[in-house]
């Protein structure tokens, strides 16, 4: 079992393993599933008291899911709470309230932290890239009649860039933007010889999941870019690129995802050029 990287992933692991846990750990399971805000904000002592278990049981619970301690597990609850806060101002305030250490606040501090974190994320992307997956992704794009691209909310900028870049090649890219509330009408045109590129990160956009479900139902090939192998999008994918983005405080970057997308487009340009 791999360590969960999002709250949704952890909650699914807890539900899947619930029956195999001891009674004490089942007790903790029920509490953490039903009281996400408490786990995010409260101390270990308070959580243990409210769950009616010794603090050591919380540590055993975290260890059972491959965390080094309960505080490490708490981070998933805290970041999920922050991510569900739409306002960036409220998000920054929440993070300061939850963070015991000093939070970088000057523009230079924030720039340096993002630069450092993005550099690490890009190095990790290159180190973990699988040549066969990249080759297959480029070939799927080259063979497609039409390339449908789905990426909403914070993933929209990546989807829009991919559409823009592909429009400069001999491709037929279509951005599934749901303009005028017509997403269902847009995706109804997807056919078996098309490719769907879906981009979404936790918390996953329901509309993007709907696109993947529809594409699967008509037999279209799918390339997914997401943050977990158990992302709801991964189920429908022919190729799934798991990208770990840089994160500074409560804010995630998009540098690694954009790097991957740009690399695929440029590789496709070379591939199409060879065919002339």
Label every PLM stretch briefly.
Residues 130-140:
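Short, acidic loop-to-helix structural element flanking the phosphoryl-transfer center
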Residues 136, 271-276:
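Active-site phosphate/pyrophosphate-binding segments
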């Amino acid at each position: 079992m791999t360590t969960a990287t999002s709250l949704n992933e952890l909650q699914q692991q807890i539900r899947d393993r619930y029956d195999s846990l001891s009674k004490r750990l089942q007790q903790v399971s029920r509490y953490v599933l039903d009281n996400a805000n408490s786990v995010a904000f409260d101390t270990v002592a308070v959580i243990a008291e409210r769950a009616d278990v010794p603090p050591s049981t919380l540590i055993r619970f975290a260890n059972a899911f491959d965390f080094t301690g309960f505080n490490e597990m708490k981070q998933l609850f805290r970041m999920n709470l922050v991510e569900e806060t739409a306002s960036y101002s409220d998000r920054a305030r929440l993070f300061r309230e939850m963070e015991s250490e000093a939070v970088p606040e000057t523009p230079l501090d924030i720039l340096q932290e993002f630069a450092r974190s993005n550099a690490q994320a890009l190095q990790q992307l290159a180190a973990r890239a699988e040549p066969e997956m990249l080759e297959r992704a480029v070939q799927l794009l080259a063979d497609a009649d039409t390339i449908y691209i789905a990426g909403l909310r914070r993933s929209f900028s990546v989807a829009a860039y991919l559409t823009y870049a592909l429009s400069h090649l001999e491709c037929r890219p279509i951005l599934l933007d749901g303009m005028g509330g017509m997403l269902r009408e847009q995706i109804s045109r997807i056919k078996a010889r098309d490719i769907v590129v879906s981009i979404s990160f936790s918390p996953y956009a329901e509309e993007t999941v709907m696109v993947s479900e529809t594409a699967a139902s008509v037999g279209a090939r799918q390339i997914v870019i997401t943050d977990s192998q158990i992302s709801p999008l991964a189920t429908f994918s022919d190729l799934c690129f798991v990208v770990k983005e840089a994160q500074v405080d409560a804010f995630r970057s998009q540098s690694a995802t954009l790097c991957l997308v740009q690399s695929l487009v440029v590789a496709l340009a070379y591939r199409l050029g060879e065919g002339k």
